[in-house]
UniProtKB/Swiss-Prot annotation:
Encoding gene (name): WDL6
Extent of Polar residues compositional bias: 25-56
Function summary: Microtubule-associated protein (MAP) that regulates the orientation of interphase cortical microtubules.
Full protein name: Protein WVD2-like 6
Tissue: Expressed in seedlings.
Phosphoserine: modified positions: 113
Source species of the chain: Arabidopsis thaliana
Low complexity bias locations: 103-118, 336-348
Length: 403
């Protein structure tokens, strides 16, 4: 016969000692005089016991403890080599449990009544070695259910602690933001700023409109006042004539002055040529002195220039129309004119060309005067003119350098 083990759900334990079965339990009623027969460790109804276990949920820890106890009981049975028969257990009024063979088990405690067991809703579990495989299968079914329930409980507790619930009491999702009952101060301040700026803009627009209206009124009043003044005036003002206005100054045109530079002297010339050129330059640059009259003498203050006649001096302006005196004739006949040493041929030719023209002019001017004069004077003047012509060839113009 196979070994069996008995486990009580309400805390009662079955002990095997010396081939006898004893049962320990707490009695709810101390005065219970009825005896009952418990079928424990029976091999006749293993399926009924297994069906009763399916309706109950047992924690993992209790199942593990029960399995350990079963292993110990089996080991003791195999070592003893005895088979345990089914035993009827009776309960006396004294509260002691007596076996069918008449021996009393030591340390026996009163057993609970079936009423208390039915009230508590717990039953004894009987497991058999042959049906051991069916129990772990049922335990594996119960384990995922327990894990799922535990996970749900833990998730709900974490959600309650981490995220607040809505007003309705429904938990929020993890991704959704919490809806707080208050609003941020930033939003309130932003609204106040908008209101303040809108009021400022309205004030600014109102001020601008007032300014525009005031300016328009001021212009209208000024125009009306000017019209009244014009009407009150007895005369009309005419525009100012143009000649009262100051004329604009004429613009002075700047004339460009021609820059003339003197020619540089040629150093490669001969000495003779350089002397002749210097003499020509002296004659050209120095002014010419007029002829002196015969009766005048050269002053002592003015020195005589080289190449000049000693008797010649500056000639004061004399009227050409006046006749010459006989004393002048004698001076001209007695005086000798010395030719100039440093006079060139060019100066002589120029003087010869100019002097005959002057003499012709003198004759033309003196002719009307001579007509009125005596015939004797006219005869005397004729030889004078001839003498003057002859002397003009011999007279050389004196060149003097002004200091």
């Amino acid at each position: 016969m196979d070994s069996e083990s008995v486990v009580a759900a309400d805390g009662a334990d079955c002990a095997i000692a010396n081939g006898e079965v004893t049962m320990e339990g707490d009695s709810s009623n101390g005065n219970g005089g009825t005896s009952e027969n418990l079928e424990c460790c029976s091999t006749q109804h293993p399926m009924e016991a297994s069906e009763g276990t399916q309706n109950e949920q047992v924690d993992d820890s209790k199942q593990m403890r029960g399995q350990k106890v079963q292993g110990r009981v089996k080991h003791e049975k195999t070592s003893g080599g005895k088979n345990i028969p089914s035993v009827l257990v009776k309960k006396k009024k004294d509260g002691k449990v007596v076996a069918s063979n008449g021996s009393v088990a030591p340390n026996v405690k009163p057993v609970k009544s079936p009423k208390s067991k039915s009230l508590n809703g717990r039953e004894a579990h009987v497991t058999k070695h042959g049906n051991h495989d069916s129990l772990p299968a049922e335990g594996t079914r119960d384990k995922p259910k327990l894990r799922e329930t535990r996970k749900q409980v833990n998730d709900t507790s974490e959600d309650d602690t981490q995220y607040p619930k809505e007003d309705d009491g429904k938990p929020r999702r993890a991704s959704a933001l919490p809806n707080y009952g208050f609003s941020f101060r930033c939003d309130q301040r932003a609204e106040k700023r908008r209101e303040f700026y809108s009021k400022l803009e309205e004030k600014i627009h109102a001020k601008e409109e007032e300014k525009n209206t005031v300016q328009a009124k001021s212009k209208e009043t000024q125009e009306a006042e000017l019209k009244m003044l014009r009407k009150s005036l007895n005369f009309k003002a005419t525009p100012m004539p143009t000649f009262y206005q100051e004329p604009q100054l004429p613009k002075t045109e700047l004339k460009k002055i021609a820059i003339t530079r003197p020619k540089s002297p040629k150093l490669g010339r001969k000495k003779t040529n350089s002397r002749a050129d210097s003499e020509e330059a002296i004659t050209i640059q120095t002014p010419r002195f007029g002829r002196l009259s015969l009766d005048e003498k050269t002053p002592k203050d003015n020195p005589v220039v080289e190449g000049s006649v000693p008797g010649e001096t500056k000639k004061p302006p004399v009227r050409k129309s006046l006749p010459r005196l006989p004393s002048e004739k004698t001076n001209l006949s007695n005086g000798k004119v010395a030719p100039a040493k440093a006079v060139t041929a060019s100066t002589k030719a120029k003087s010869e060309r100019k002097k005959p023209d002057k003499d012709v002019d003198d004759l033309s001017q003196s002719s009307p005067v001579d007509d009125n004069a005596d015939p004797e004077d006219s005869q005397e003047q004729a030889p004078r003119v001839n003498e003057d012509r002859n002397e003009s060839h011999m007279v050389v113009e004196v060149v003097a350098v002004e200091p």
